[in-house]
Amino acid sequence: MKYTRIFLVFLLSAGFAFGQRTVTGVVSDPDGLPLPGATVIIDGTTSGVTTDFDGNYSIAVEEGVSLVFSFVGYESQSVVVGSQNTLNISLSEGNQLSEVVVTALGLEREARSLGYAVTTVGSEEIEQKGVADVARTLTGKVAGVNITNTTSTSGSGTNVIIRGMTSITGSNQPLFVVDGVPFNSSTNGESGSFWNGITESSRFLDLDPNSIEKVDVLKGLNATVLYGQQGRNGVILITTKNGSGARPSAKGTEVTVSHSTFVNEPVLPDYQNDYGGGFHQLFGFFFSNGGPNFDPAINDPRQFGPYYLREDANNVYVKHPYDYIANRSLVEPEFADLVGTEYAYRNYRGVENFFDPGLVNTTSLNLRSSGDNGFFNMSFGRTDDEGFTPNNRLRKTNFGLGGAATLENGIRINGTLNYANTDYTTPPIAASLGSGSVSSYTSSIFGDVMYTPRSVDLMGLPYITSDGRSIYYRSGNDIQNPRWTAENAFDAELINRVFGTFGAAYDINDNWTLAYKYGIDNTSQFSEHAQNKGGVDGNATGIYYTSDEIRTIQNHSFTLSFNDQLDDDWSLTALVGADANRETYSGRSTTNENQLVFGVL
């Protein structure tokens, strides 16, 4: 069966490839001038390309799909691919021609004057999406950017790749810059690796998607060179509502309150529903390559051997799985009433019944007041996310202040202050084989539940003894019951983070501007990894690991810039500056093993 499935996958892939062809063309403006860096994306997907310096593109598509062509400052255009192999597109000018992009070191440039690809994602595409992670809200919105989750649990880490895998051992994630200051978005690895099942969140979580004004993704090397080594993997610029004064309120003061509720359902593998556990169509309380058919009219009692008791029109009945648990102290006297009883051999849909619908509630408040000489903004956000995996949850609170003003002496000042509290808990998720977690350090809830045979009543069988030990259907009790894992093992994080900026700028004359910006980012993180004794996977004698970490990053930047608009088509810009960055880290950890009594965690 395994080899048949692999063959079918390759066969279907080949059939899909034959249905595709390559479409080429040029994307230009109304005057016929090519648009370098324009985005061409297959509608409804994350697949796409960008045009080269001459506006040329080439993309493999199927007939009948829609291609969306877009470029900053122009109206997007959607075209259905017919039988043609060439599509030349002329984009009309939109209402964003005067839009500026905050580029390296906080410099504002008109989007059309840039010599590299920039993709802008507005707040309307980020807000109220039921996703607490800013990086995940960008999924499918930026061509060429690959965004993946480390796991499917709520609050787990996110990987963002712009330029492909440029490093084998180092990070491939781009630099995130929030309101002009580099922002630490790493996934903490102090507590262990994903291979060991430590499911850390990313610090993208400390940003509130509902407080973001826009996101600019800088892809080209020229766009990121001013950030040096930090920008080697690309740069993602985030402008928050607290840090942006570019959109004054017509009413003077605006208050926006919003709430959203989303339900999440797991997407599970496709399971067959005709056969139970066994080997070569012979019944057994284990899994290998499939036991007898569930239909009594098809199977033969001889397939069940000594397990067989009786059958009726609907089911075959066998001896209870706990009749065969080798360690009788797990069964007797506690579950002695089950010994000798009959057990229906049927499809229990244990995997599907293990998960519950997840529920995400998000509430946000934004107050904005602006006038002739400045603005003030306050934001508040709260996310309560109950994951569909048992005992997985995310609680997040964000609060932010920001403002800008022009003083009488002409000096412009601005500042932001943000606080984030993130509380994240999940069962451990280690890499797994059919026999359980590959890690000697921890267990794996997905590994244990996904390999459950269809004939095992996962949600009906007892899963824990009175003294706290895991019990499951296999005679050797050598796989940990995932229900036991959900209640007795966890990874948890509690993060308190304060970050903000202060900036000042002064126009020496019409061409020269002197500017200074200070940024601070302080993160305090307490992490726990725990499992009660009595399990099977990982550390069966119990483990409790904790780590305390404090990371502080301070950034100072000074710039002297020159800007002269020579005529309607030509401008001259120059910049000289200095940047200083200081990062401090302190941490400690403890590991406690060989738990003396059951059930203390």
Walk through the language-model features, giving the residues of each:
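Short, solvent-exposed loop/edge-beta patches enriched in aromatic
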Residues: S369-G374, L407-N409, A504-T513, D568
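Short, small/polar-rich motifs associated with maturation and membrane association
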Residues: M1-L8, G15-G400, A404-L407, R412-N414, ...
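Surface-exposed loop/interface segments of Gram-negative outer-membrane beta-barrel transport/assembly proteins
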Residues: R112, N172-Q173, G245-A344, G387-N392, ...
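Alpha-helical support elements that line or immediately flank enzyme active sites
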Residues: S193-W195, G500-Y506, I520-N522
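Acidic-histidine catalytic/liganding microenvironments
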Residues: V142, N509, L596
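N-terminal capping/interface segment
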Residues: I6, L105-L107, R346, G503-T513, ...
